Curated annotation (Swiss-Prot):
Cofactor(s) required for function per UniProt: FMN
Enzyme Commission number: 1.-.-.-
Protein species of origin: Parvibaculum lavamentivorans (strain DS-1 / DSM 13023 / NCIMB 13966)
Name of the top EC class for this enzyme: oxidoreductase
InterPro entries reported for this sequence: Nitroreductase (IPR029479), Nitroreductase-like (IPR000415), Nitroreductase_HadB/RutE (IPR050461), RutE-like (IPR023936)
UniProt xrefs under CDD domains: RutE-like (cd02148)
Pfam families named in the record: Nitroreductase (PF00881)
Coiled-coil features, chain-numbered ranges: none
Protein name: Putative NADH dehydrogenase/NAD(P)H nitroreductase Plav_3612
Amino acid sequence: MSGKLGDDALDILFRDARTHNGWKAEPVSDETLRALYDLMKWGPTSANCSPARIIFVKSKEAKEKLAPALSEGNLKKTMAAPVTAIIGYDVEFYERLPELFPHDPTAKNWFNWSKEWAEQTAFRNGSLQGAYFMIAARSLGLDCGPMSGFDMRKVDDAFFAGTTVKVNFLCNIGHGDPSALFARSPRLSFEDACKII
């Protein structure tokens, strides 16, 4: 791979991108959600394990199902967002490794020997995929509002009962209302966050 993105693209993905709390009344099509996933799925994960599982909450009924799990500060903005993505991770992701990692038919055994190790792997790589999700959304012209203020057990019971999937975080997506943004917060400098050794 060669070449690099220009400043306009980098602004869209990072420098000008914000966490949105207010939303315009503009729908997000199912086709756009499919396109979003079809971008994010190419991001790297350990042994291509791809543990992320996503539920796109769009309907009024589904939003009402989600509402009891939300913290007070996240309720209004989530109800107003065109889509709320429940980003989950499958703790038994390894069952799909014969399909996803055909280079080595024993790859499933790298993870299924320990529930703790499998869940750590699923959470770590599912979190990576959650970041890819937001970058893919921004690249398609959508804004994001990731959240961790919710009751995990309530979300799991309402949306993942009877499965091996657990919620990681929630992410509202749509077209953000810039008038609802806070002033941008600072970030750590390179010197504060990094070392070259």
